[in-house]
């Protein structure tokens, strides 16, 4: 469905991971893969401040000050990626974090999706994290999917073949950047 839920945001998943690790329900992760940006690009009315701050602006504030901010004070995508990733880096210092940009979608204007993906990629660069550019490299092409549904069921969500191909692609890309 095209409805947003707070359970889909990365921060809530991070909170659950931290809580589960603290309570012994989950071991400390060695690898954290964050796939983000699709809803940020898809729902501009619900997320009007997503592109309100550049990556450079999001990284102006020193870490010592930025780390004391609360989740509700980080509104732009660049600030959110910085906040979430630095929190994970602080709590799980031995885990490798890999960021995934969103795949192309017929439901999202290409320029908006690419702006979101570029923001995520630049944040990854600033944080020295590996980034997999699904918007550029995955099997899903919005232009092709507009003509015929090759790898998606609806122009956004992968079908069986799209999931299989993208799964192989992600496995290859992520295994190539593993640091252990």
Task: List the predicted regions and their residue ranges.
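A short alpha-helix capping/helix-coil boundary motif
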Residues: 63-65, 93, 97-101, 144-146
């Amino acid at each position: 469905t095209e409805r947003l839920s707070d359970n889909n945001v990365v921060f809530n998943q991070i909170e659950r991971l931290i809580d589960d690790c603290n309570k012994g329900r989950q071991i400390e992760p060695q690898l954290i893969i964050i796939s983000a940006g699709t809803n940020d690009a898809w729902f501009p009315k619900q997320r009007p401040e997503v592109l309100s701050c550049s990556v450079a602006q999001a990284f102006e504030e020193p870490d010592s000050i930025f780390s004391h901010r609360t989740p509700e004070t980080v509104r732009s995508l660049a600030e959110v990626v910085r906040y979430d990733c630095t929190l994970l880096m602080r709590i799980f210092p031995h885990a490798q974090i890999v960021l995934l940009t969103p795949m192309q979608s017929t439901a999202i204007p290409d320029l908006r999706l690419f702006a979101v993906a570029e923001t995520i990629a630049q944040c990854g660069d600033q944080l020295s994290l590996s980034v997999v550019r699904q918007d550029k490299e995955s099997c899903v092409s919005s232009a092709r999917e507009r003509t015929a549904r090759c790898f998606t069921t609806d122009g956004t969500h992968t079908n069986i073949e799209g999931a299989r191909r993208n799964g192989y692609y992600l496995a290859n890309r992520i295994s190539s950047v593993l640091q252990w």
